[in-house]
Amino acid sequence: MGMGLGFGFLAMALHWESFVHDWVAPWGTIFMRLLKLIAVPLVLVSLILGVVNLKDIRNLSRIGLKTILIYVCTTILAVSIGLGMVSVIKPGKVFPKDRQTEFMERYQQTVVEREAQMQQMKDESPLQFVVDMVPENLFKALGDNSKMLQIIFFALLFGVALIVVGPSKVPSLVRFFQQLNLVLLKIIDFIMAFAPYGVFALMSALIVDYAGDVGIFSALGLYALTVVLALAVIILLVYPFIMRVFGKRTMKQFFNAAAPVQMLAFTTSSSAATLPLTLERTQKHLGVSEEVSSFVLPVGVTINMDGTSCYQAVAAVFLAQVLGLDLTFGQMLLILATATISSIGTPGIPGGSIVMLMIVLDSVGIPIEGLALILGIDRPLDMLRTVVNVTGDMTVSCVVDNTKK
């Protein structure tokens, strides 16, 4: 990653931007595609095996309920930290007013597109996200990485059916999934061997894309710092505390295991793409049982978005400050509730978190046009949010595993 950063800055200095885009960036794209290629079958197979390994419906319901409750609690805590940090620092109070019009014009088209998506979601039934969990066609869902909730639903349904039928009655089917899982893990080994080159390409392309626009970073510097500080509190204080008290792992052990996962999450900005490595590090280096990690981690990829929820809270209050709006305590609570719920209902579409942020803004009366002010710096912050998301997944898996014993 460091070499990718260095090469990116070197390319900027030597005006090699076109070379990076034409000859370096494609390798990063290939690496991302390989990760996404393996993510869906891995979630399906690992979750089915995770359910089957629980051996009993009561174990599944107990662990499932515990997992969801812990995920919701950490999300509420993450949003609260974001609200507290942005309320204390007040980055919106120092945003240069002369840059508002410039940013509004630059990203207006993106805002319009996201607004249309938001309006479509608002017109749907409140239970639409539940409807969307149930696939009409399994193979269609398997061919679309954005349908991860549908894949999880089918995997849980299939796993429960296997338990009810009895694994002893269909040993060849259970053995098939176990052997398929071994093959998938070997494919993951192949992909991870390519990881250094893929990360190098991704970081080089990122620097070339963003280093030239210093204006965005100078205008949004305090806002970005607020987001980073809030995420740092979660990842450096909250998770280690939870891990130490409830997960019974030392901070050193935890971060040694999580570091490669965090690095991959930072470069890919995708929890799903990071899942293969997350499973491997959680099982082998944190000692979490396969039955727990195979269930908790795939579920967490979809519903645990601590970093994203924290970011939404900071962004909403920041925009209110920039636009001169004073939020009441009740509106703060509404942001807390909306951001928490959206962590489960975030759509699996490009810019899905931005669409959900629009709903958060709309719920408290903040003009959604203000979103244009922060879109320019969203990608770097998205990388950091993903680091928090995957770290939270690993933390919760350790807690569930420890409390199961």
Descriptions of predicted regions:
Residues 59-66, 186-190, 285-300, 329-330, ...:
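Membrane-interface alpha-helices at helix entry/exit sites of multi-pass transporters
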Residues 5-16, 32-35, 66-76, 80, ...:
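Signature of multi-pass transmembrane helix bundles
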Residues 1-47:
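Anchoring transmembrane alpha helix of integral membrane proteins
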Residues 260-343, 396-397, 404-405:
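Helix-loop-helix junctions within the multi-pass membrane cores of secondary transporters/permeases
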Residues 313-405:
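Transmembrane alpha-helical segments and their short flanking loops
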